C-alpha cells in the first residue's frame, strides 16, 4: 500500500505549511487551486499511517447531507489516487460517518473502514454535545470564509472541537476562497488580511490566559495564471483570486471641498473591523463618507456599536447620542453613502446586515 502526497508545482502544494506543525492552519487562495484535494489526501494518509480519523466540517447542514458529501469526495484526481494507493474506490457518507468503500460485483458501494465524521456548525450546539467521537485528530473546515456567518461562529467551532477531541491534540485545516477580508477566524488567529500579501506563509503565536502558547499558520497562496473562459468581474474573482466585491458609490468630490459636520466610528463585534465615518455637507446635500479605520487592540469590543469617542487606552466606547445616530440612519436609508473603494463598501455593507436599526 503506497500513498504519496502531491509534490509538484502545477497545483497547490501544502508541504511547507504541514511541516510547520501548527494545530491551527488556514489556507486561502483563488478557486480550483487544488488546496482541498491536498488536505483531504493529507488526512487520508494520516489515517493509514497512524489510524487517526478526520472531521469534515461545513457551516450549514445542507452541505453535510450524504449526496453533497459524496460529491465533495468524488473528485476524479482523488479517487484515482486512492484506488491506486489503497485499492479502495472512494469515500462515502453514511449517518454522519465517513467510510472507505469498494465497488462490489453488483456495482454497489461496499462500506469499509470508518475514516471520519461530518459536522455542521449551525446544528452543532444541539446535535453533537453528548456524543463520543473517538480517534478524531484532523479537521477540514471547507469554505470557512463566507459572506455571512452564524452567530458566535468561532466559539461554536471551538466548542465542536472540544466536544469531539476532548483534551486530545488536534490539527485544523481551514480552507477558503478570496471572498471577503472581514473574517472572524483569521482575526482570532491574529492574521490581519489588510496587511498580508499572497505568496507567503504567515505564523502567529497566541498566548492563552494560563500562559500556554498556540501556534497558528496561514498560507496565503499566490494566484496562478490560467487560461479560462471567464471575463469581467468573474475573471477577477474566479481566475485571478481577487476579493469578491460589489460596485459601490465613491467620493465624487474632493473631501477638502466639503464641510465636515462630525466624525464617528463603527465597530463590528463579530468581524472585528472598524470604520471611520464622516458626515459631510457638499452642494446642499449631506453624505456619509466611509473608509477603513484600523487599530491594534480590538478584541475587547462586546457590541456592534457607533461611537464618536473610542477610548482605546481605557477600552471603553461611548454610544452616539440619539440625534446623531438618527441622522446617520436617515442618510443610510436614503442611499447617501460614499466609500473609499469597492472593497471597503462591500465589507461595510456586510457588517451593517447584522445591525438591526439599518435593516
PLM regions and their residue ranges:
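Phosphate/NTP-binding elements of NTP-utilizing enzymes
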Residues: 2-359
Amino acid at each position: 500500500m503506497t500513498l504519496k502526497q502531491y509534490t509538484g508545482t502545477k497545483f497547490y502544494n501544502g508541504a511547507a505549511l504541514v511541516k510547520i506543525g501548527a494545530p491551527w492552519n488556514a489556507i486561502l487562495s483563488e478557486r480550483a487551486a487544488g488546496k482541498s484535494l491536498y488536505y483531504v489526501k493529507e488526512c487520508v494518509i494520516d489515517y493509514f499511517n497512524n489510524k487517526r480519523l478526520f472531521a469534515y466540517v461545513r457551516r450549514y447542514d445542507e452541505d453535510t447531507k450524504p449526496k453533497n458529501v459524496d460529491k465533495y469526495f468524488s473528485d476524479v484526481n482523488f479517487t484515482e489516487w486512492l484506488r491506486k494507493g489503497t485499492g479502495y474506490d472512494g469515500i462515502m457518507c453514511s449517518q454522519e460517518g465517513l467510510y472507505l468503500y469498494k465497488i462490489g460485483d453488483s456495482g454497489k458501494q461496499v462500506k469499509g473502514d470508518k475514516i471520519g465524521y461530518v459536522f455542521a456548525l449551525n446544528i452543532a450546539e444541539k446535535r453533537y454535545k453528548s456524543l463520543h467521537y473517538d480517534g478524531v485528530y484532523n479537521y477540514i473546515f471547507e469554505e470557512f470564509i463566507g459572506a455571512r456567518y452564524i452567530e458566535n461562529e468561532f466559539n461554536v467551532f471551538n466548542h465542536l472541537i472540544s466536544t469531539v477531541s476532548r483534551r486530545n491534540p488536534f490539527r485544523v485545516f481551514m480552507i477558503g476562497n478570496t471572498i471577503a477580508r472581514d473574517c472572524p477566524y483569521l482575526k482570532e488567529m491574529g492574521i490581519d488580511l489588510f496587511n498580508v500579501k499572497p505568496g507567503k506563509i504567515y505564523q502567529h503565536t497566541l498566548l492563552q490566559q494560563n500562559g500556554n502558547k498556540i501556534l497558528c499558520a496561514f498560507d496565503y497562496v499566490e494566484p496562478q495564471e490560467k487560461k479560462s473562459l471567464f471575463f469581467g468581474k468573474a475573471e477577477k474573482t474566479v481566475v485571478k483570486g481577487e476579493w469578491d466585491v460589489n460596485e459601490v458609490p465613491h467620493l465624487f468630490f474632493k473631501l477638502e471641498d466639503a464641510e465636515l459636520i462630525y466624525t464617528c466610528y463603527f465597530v463590528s463585534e463579530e468581524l472585528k473591523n472598524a470604520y471611520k465615518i464622516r458626515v459631510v455637507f457638499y452642494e446642499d446635500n449631506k453624505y456619509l463618507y466611509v473608509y477603513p479605520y484600523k487599530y491594534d487592540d480590538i478584541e475587547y469590543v462586546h457590541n456592534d456599536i457607533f461611537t464618536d469617542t473610542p477610548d482605546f487606552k481605557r477600552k471603553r466606547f461611548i454610544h452616539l447620542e440619539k440625534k446623531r445616530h438618527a441622522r446617520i440612519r436617515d442618510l443610510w436609508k436614503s442611499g447617501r453613502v460614499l466609500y473609499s473603494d469597492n472593497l471597503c463598501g462591500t465589507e461595510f455593507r456586510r457588517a451593517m446586515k447584522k445591525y438591526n436599526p439599518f435593516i
